[in-house]
């Protein structure tokens, strides 16, 4: 009987199987029940290559409706709502009280203010128009009041051929003669040939004389504009009444004033 065949290790496989390699022991990830040190733990992180992020503690958080737990690190935490949720009840009560107070204050202001003056008509008058009308009315009243109280009464004076106008105060004169002499001095450089503006002639005093002939004897005559915008010769009214209705004065040539005559001459001519 032949002896049994025995395996022979020609290439050294039995020795390699008996001694484990260090690479296989280091790469093994199974737990070592003998308490030996395990290999480094591999984790997936976000960052640049070679940078080390701080260690963070893994916290198992469930799905809850309460506030977020306080964060431990600022770098790894996200922005969250401020920790004011426990005071939500108190703050809502204060907000409601403030809103009620604002409504109480706004209630009286909702009523429209009483208008000072109701505008009648259409289209309505703008504010600046109302102010202008009121100012003009008050100015007219002031002028009438000043005239009634004896204030200055200035009127414009113009002359045929004179390039400028003058103003005189009728309250400073007491008669037509004083006014005529004052105007003659003002326009002395334009008046020639006559010593007075309103020097009446014999024909002017006669009621049966022609008014055109009476005016031809004078080089210049003094006329005025009354309240009705009519031009009349000076001297047909009493002086006090003349100062109240005179608006403008004009020194005209006698030939141009042939169609203008005092009211007394016109009335006498119509009566005849």
Curated annotation (Swiss-Prot):
Tissue specificity note: Highly expressed in roots and flowers. Expressed in shoots.
Superkingdom to which the source organism belongs: Eukaryota
Regulation: induction: Not induced by auxin.
Short motif EAR-like (transcriptional repression), span: 44-48
UniProt feature, compositional bias: Low complexity: 14-33, 40-50
GO BP annotation list: auxin-activated signaling pathway; regulation of DNA-templated transcription
Annotated Gene Ontology cellular component terms: nucleus
Keywords: Auxin signaling pathway, Nucleus, Repressor, Transcription, Transcription regulation
Stretch list, region Disordered: 1-92
PB1 domain residues: 152-256
Subcellular location(s) per record: Nucleus
Record family assignment: Belongs to the Aux/IAA family.
Subunit structure: Homodimers and heterodimers.
Stated role: Aux/IAA proteins are short-lived transcriptional factors that function as repressors of early auxin response genes at low auxin concentrations.
Protein's UniProt name: Auxin-responsive protein IAA5
Species of provenance: Oryza sativa subsp. indica
């Amino acid at each position: 009987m032949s002896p049994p065949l025995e395996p022979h290790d020609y290439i050294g496989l039995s020795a390699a199987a008996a001694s484990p390699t260090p690479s296989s022991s280091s790469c093994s990830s199974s737990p070592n029940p003998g308490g030996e040190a395990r290999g480094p733990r591999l984790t997936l992180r976000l960052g640049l290559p070679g940078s080390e992020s701080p260690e963070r503690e893994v916290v198992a958080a469930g799905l809850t409706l309460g506030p977020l737990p306080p964060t431990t690190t600022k770098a790894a935490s996200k922005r969250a709502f401020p920790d004011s949720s426990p005071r939500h009840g108190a703050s809502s009560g204060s907000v409601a009280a403030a809103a009620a107070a604002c409504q109480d204050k706004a209630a009286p202001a909702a009523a429209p203010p009483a208008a000072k003056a109701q505008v009648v008509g259409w289209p309505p008058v703008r504010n600046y128009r109302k102010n202008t009308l009121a100012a003009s009315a008050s100015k007219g009243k002031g002028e009438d009041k000043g005239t009634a109280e004896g204030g200055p009464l200035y009127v414009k004076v113009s002359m045929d051929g004179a390039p400028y106008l003058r103003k005189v105060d009728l309250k400073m004169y007491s008669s037509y003669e004083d006014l005529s002499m004052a105007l003659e001095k003002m326009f002395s450089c334009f008046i020639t040939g006559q010593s007075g503006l309103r020097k009446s002639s014999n024909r002017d005093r006669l009621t049966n004389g022609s008014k055109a002939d009476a005016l031809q004897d004078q080089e210049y005559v003094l006329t005025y504009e009354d309240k009705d915008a009519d031009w009349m010769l000076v001297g047909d009214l009493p002086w006090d009444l003349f100062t109240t209705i005179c608006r403008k004065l004009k020194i005209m040539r006698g030939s141009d004033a042939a169609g203008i005559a005092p009211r007394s001459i016109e009335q006498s001519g119509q009566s005849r």
